[in-house]
Amino acid sequence: MVPKLFTSQICLLLLLGLLAVEGSLHVKPPQFTWAQWFETQHINMTSQQCTNAMQVINNYQRRCKNQNTFLLTTFANVVNVCGNPNMTCPSNKTRKNCHQSGSQVPLIHCNLTTPSPQNISNCRYAQTPANMFYIVACDNRDQRRDPPQYPVVPVHLDRII
């Protein structure tokens, strides 16, 4: 009885730990709105090389992000996708605020190859260019902090297909 209870408690702790890690992956820095954080992570590729471009994101999160996709398009173009028909979000079936792009866009997918937990500036990434459709989640803008020209804005890159 005791070993089963102990094993169950360990499994529960591991599960809670995994949920905490997963939840922390979707935390935005407090100085950003969700739309601003989307633009920083997925539109503003500050360098042609993933290793350099990811340093910006990693510095905000204080960790090496495992992967990231940069859409080589404008924020305004992604905002326009928010006007496409609503669909269920593939990554979260309870969310109905996703929209699929009507055409493929060039993108660069960055994948962490060399983690460096002690010094995030040493994280290294491989990059894969592609042309793909994408699905974004969109929400109403933050009325106090987002520009008024876009009432609905992208807040999450849900999937590339």
UniProtKB/Swiss-Prot annotation:
GO terms for biological process: chemotaxis; defense response to virus; innate immune response in mucosa. It catalyses: an [RNA] containing cytidine + H2O = an [RNA]-3'-cytidine-3'-phosphate + a 5'-hydroxy-ribonucleotide-3'-[RNA]; an [RNA] containing uridine + H2O = an [RNA]-3'-uridine-3'-phosphate + a 5'-hydroxy-ribonucleotide-3'-[RNA]. Changing residue 95 to C: In haplotype 3. Coiled coil: none annotated. Disulfide bonds join 50-110, 64-123, 82-138, 89-98. Interacts with and forms a tight 1:1 complex with RNH1. Dimerization of two such complexes may occur. This is Non-secretory ribonuclease. It comes from Pan troglodytes (Chimpanzee).
